[in-house]
């Protein structure tokens, strides 16, 4: 009888240890949900105030919910704001806006990198249902979104600007975009990070270049666009898919609908003659009036079905598979 009781006690203890959530996980001891509302109904009226109130390097994810409104502020997610999500009520009416640009900042040759409306330095960041815009206009470099963190996710967002709208920094950083809208003029998606764009609309507002990847030597992938719509404003006459900001740039368009008037050659070199030998530009199964594979420049590539099949989010993002990318 005593043996049976001891066995029962041990079994119950084992079950409790395995299946009971520790109190620290149920209540981490810090606030994990915040609301920002301009009418005062939330915890804060400004986004930056909410970010500054969060715990540094939290064990549990933190969510800041943004009520509808136009938030005119420069927002910075610091490196210690890891596992942070900013979730808007809806994309069209939840807007973060600012109007800095190169000459206004006036901090020397690198002023571009200070012009952001939203800058993300932290890892494991998520933005959803939000518009981020730089309203400086056609006055030179003016960044809307600047990302330096790793494993950053953007779902159902809009990024609006002119030159240099989206800057994806970090030589080993990985970013994932799904169902997003991005517009701009010159080089409006640029940087050295690895990024996957799924089912996004990419809209050129002038005759210019869509991408300017600066992939570093030795990195296997740069920007990959999958099943995206490439569109243009009505008065646009010619758009290039990209040009290499650095000589090892890598950009691929997979099964994209090229509705914009893409230049027949598709891609263009920068000033460096070595670009043609070291850059990797490719397409697979492009559709629409801008798809002219036989007229593309000789140093670009048309992928085979087998080659294209090797391009998956998990492979491109080196084993990181964000929830938004899962079927």
Predicted regions, residues:
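Sequence-level preference for short, compositionally simple segments enriched
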Residues: 26-327
């Amino acid at each position: 009888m005593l043996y049976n009781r001891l066995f029962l006690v041990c079994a119950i203890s084992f079950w409790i240890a395995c299946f009971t959530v520790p109190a620290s996980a149920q209540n981490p001891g810090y606030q994990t949900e915040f609301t920002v509302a301009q009418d005062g109904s939330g915890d804060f009226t400004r986004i930056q105030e909410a970010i500054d109130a969060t715990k540094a390097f939290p064990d549990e994810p933190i969510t800041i919910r943004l009520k509808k409104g136009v938030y005119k502020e420069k927002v910075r997610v610091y490196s210690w704001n890891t596992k942070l999500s900013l979730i808007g009520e809806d994309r069209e009416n939840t807007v973060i806006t600012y109007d800095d640009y190169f000459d206004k900042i006036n901090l020397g040759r690198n002023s571009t990198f200070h012009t952001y409306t939203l800058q993300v330095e932290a890892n494991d960041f998520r933005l959803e249902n939000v518009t981020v815009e730089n309203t400086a206009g056609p006055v030179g470099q003016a960044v809307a979104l600047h990302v330096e963190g790793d494993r950053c996710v953007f779902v159902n967002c809009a990024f609006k600007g002119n030159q240099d709208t989206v800057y994806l920094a970090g030589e080993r950083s990985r970013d994932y975009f799904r169902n997003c809208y991005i517009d701009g003029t010159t080089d409006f998606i640029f940087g050295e990070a690895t990024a996957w764009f799924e089912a996004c609309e990419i809209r050129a507002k002038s005759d210019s270049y869509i991408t300017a990847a600066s992939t570093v030597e030795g990195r296997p992938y740069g920007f990959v666009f999958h099943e995206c719509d490439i569109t243009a404003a009505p008065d646009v006459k010619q758009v290039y898919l990209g040009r290499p900001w650095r000589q090892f740039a890598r950009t691929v368009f997979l099964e994209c609908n090229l509705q914009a008037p893409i230049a027949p050659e598709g891609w263009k070199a920068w000033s460096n003659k070595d670009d043609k030998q070291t850059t990797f530009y490719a397409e697979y199964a492009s559709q629409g009036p801008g798809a002219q594979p036989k007229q593309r420049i000789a140093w670009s590539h048309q992928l085979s079905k087998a080659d294209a099949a090797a391009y998956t989010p998990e492979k491109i993002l080196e084993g990181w598979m964000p929830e938004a990318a899962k079927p």
